[in-house]
Each structure stands twice: as structure tokens, then as C-alpha cells.
Amino acid sequence: MTKKISFIINGQVEIFPESDDLVQSINFGDNSVYLPILNNSHVKNIIDYNENNKLRLHNIVNFLYTVGQRWKNEEYSRRRTYIRDLKKYMGYSEAMAKLEANWISMILCSKGGLYDVVENELGSRHIMDEWLPQDESYIKAFPKGKSIHLLAGNVPLSGIMSILRAILTKNQCIIKTSSTDPFTANALALSFIDVDPNHPITRSLSVVYWPHQGDTSLAKEIMQHMDVIVAWGGEDAINWAVEHAPPYADVIKFGSKKSFCIIDNPVDLTSAATGAAHDICFYDQRACFSAQNIYYMGNQYEEFKLALIEKLNLYAHILPNAKKDFDEKAAYSLVQKESLFAGLKVEVDVHQRWMIIESNAGVEFNQPLGRCVYLHHVDNIEQVLPYVQKNKTQTISIFPWESAFKYRDALALRGAERIVEAGMNNIFRVGGSHDGMRPLQRLVTYISHERPSHYTAKDVAVEIEQTRFLEEDKFLVFVP
């Protein structure tokens, strides 16, 4: 089966090239996706587009809500096509693909949540619409301008959030899709076009693709005209973005991270196992927030392990795994055999839907992902802290929730960036940080309009007449 995906340039769907020489392909097993090859015309149109977004925040939120209502409709053609593409090309199960579409609708339709994101990260939901008085100045946040989003394909929703952050801050949004997921950003942009092809938000979007191999001169030219770069992915992807960013541009880096779960002597083993299983199974551990290790403190270790197996089997039913290709199955089997050869105890599902490897803390072979978890029985938090690594550990999920208050300072000081209740790793709460930062702050420029000389300060209750102060040598008189 083949699928053609056209580029979207400044909100307009480009005509798909007729010549095979102008087309590139991405292979997904027996299926292929065809896309145009980036050309000079695409680049020029992206660079030349300079329409300022004069919408107010409520206009932006209302437009996103309207788009979200379409995604909420299970019969919406874009939604149905998107689910089908995730299943056919990316190997998602029906439940996984449907859940992804559901989350897109949830995020777009959460008007209160979108307002609160701006309020929490920028300090006021009005700061991009008007000048706000702050002490001795007025302040307003303006968009950086042209933002490019170099997306990874492991977590489609991360791309959605990246795009929405740029939209909420009124930036032009150029999206470079991943070879592993050329579908999500394209589907979102097409749904914007469905609602209003001439809307300023629609027109501010471009969705393109280029491979990292071969000639990337046109991609580098785009990069040189960007005001802010949002880079997702592994070390090579991040390094490429940094290398080709113009010197004045901010590079917002979302690199690969690891996460784990702490179970602290729970009374409710069923809830503990349910939360841990969720954190293992969501995205089949391809997300930075996915738990790859569990550190269990306390008694009832064996009982917890049995409960975890039960819940992993439950998730295999309610949220079935993505399809594994030959190499992934081989990697799974290899890790199992390596662990057994090393004398570790291994519990594995006969269909490779999950695997539990029991080992001492720090003893770990390769991680094949796909719901493989290393389970460590430890005595106390001090035996866990060495495995929290600065700039490498993202999310630590904890059960019971009350234990988070005991450990959060120690975990944060070691480098943990996010602490959540077990079972909540995929929900980034409003008001929280992402990889140790507030991303919206880096998508805007704060401009100050400062008060005149006759405006008195708290510590200087007279007009600021600097020439007179110099003439009369009275500066020190006003030092508090």
C-alpha cells in the first residue's frame, strides 16, 4: 500500500508532484509513504511569509476549540484517516490509535486549560494582548516570530503540544515531521484548513519533511531564517539543530530522557501495580516519561510482582501493544536470554507483550522497550538516588502519592525534572514544567515600556533628575 502526503506551505496544500524525480519515500515495512522533495519554491514561500498574528488570545483559543470539536466527532474524516494511518504504518493497535485521536480532541477542546497554560507560564493570560503595568514599567510579550519544530516520531502528542505552544504565543509555525510519524502534524494542519483555510492560524502553519541523509542545504537555509528552534529527539537531532541555528536564535531542546517508578511499601498493592503498569505500557515505553525501571521498597515484594503481572496482562487487553517487527522481536528475545544467562529471574509473556527482569539496582542489560521493565527490590531511597541523573532523568512516578513529599527534594536535587503519582506519567499537569523549563517563556520576547523620570520609585521619592544630581554631586543622598 502507498500513501501520498502533500506539503502544506503557509496554510495551503501544495499540489503533489507528478514526476517521480520530485518525490521521496519513507518505508514502513511492506507499506510506503510518498512526500514531495523540499525545493527552492517551498523555502522561499516559508521565508517570505511575514504576516503578524494580530489575534487576541480568546480568538486563538476559540479557533482551537472549534477544531477540537471536529476531532471529538468519531465520524470526522481526518480523525478516521489518522487512526487508520497510525495502525497501518506505525503499527499502533486500534485502542492506541483511537486514544491518540481522543487526546488531540481533549487538548484542543480544553479552553480553560489553554488559558491556564498561558497564565501559568507567562504570568498573565493578558500579557500578549496588552501592555501590563508591573512596578515601574509596562510589559508585553511578543512572539519571537518564525518558529521551527523539528519533531520526533515516538510520541505524536509531543508534536501537537509543540505546535500549540507556538500558536498560543502567536508565532509562525514551520513543522518538520519525523520519518517515523509524517502523519500527526499533517492531520492537524488539514483540520485547521477544514475549519477556515484563511484563518491567520491556518496561514501561519507549514508542514514539510526532509531526510537527515543527503543534501540538506535547503533545510539549513530555512534554519538560518528562524527566530526560535524547538528540537525534539536524540542526541544527533539535537546537535544538528544547535549546529545550524543562527547565533541569535534560541534552541529549545527536548532531548531523550529516561524515567522510572518508585513503589514505597504500599498498603494497596492493586492500585500500586495498576499505576506502575500504566506507566510502563503507555506508548510502549517510547516516551521520555515512560517507566523503564521500578524500585520497590518494603515488604510484599512477591505479592506486588504478581499484581504487576496481572495488570500488565490487563493493559495488554485494554491497550494492546503496537506491532513488533522482526528486529524488535529479536531484541526482546536477546535481552531475555542475556538476563537468564546472567542468572537473573525473568517473567515474560508468551506473546512478548511484556517482560519483567528482576535484578539488583544498577544491574541492567539492554532495554528493548515494548513493555520491558527492570524490577529492583531496594531497602531505602538512598539506594535509588544514584540512578537519578541530571539532564537525563525526566519523570519519577511514585506510589503512594504521599511518599512523594518525603522524597521530592532529594530527587530534585539529584536531577529529577518531574514527580508524579504512579499512573499519571502521560498527563502533564497545567502549572508544571517540561524538561525543567516553562517553554512558552522561550517562545516570546518580553518588551518593557518604562516609566518617565517624574515617576517616583519606592526607594527614591523624588523625580529622577540625573543631570541635576551630577551637577550638584548629590547621588549618594538618594542611596537608601
Swiss-Prot record:
One of its GO terms (biological process) is bioluminescence. Pathway: Lipid metabolism; fatty acid reduction for biolumincescence. Keywords: Luminescence, NADP, Oxidoreductase. It catalyses: a long-chain fatty aldehyde + NADP(+) + CoA = a long-chain fatty acyl-CoA + NADPH + H(+). SUPFAM superfamilies: ALDH-like. Belongs to the LuxC family. This is Long-chain acyl-protein thioester reductase. It comes from Photorhabdus laumondii subsp. laumondii (strain DSM 15139 / CIP 105565 / TT01).
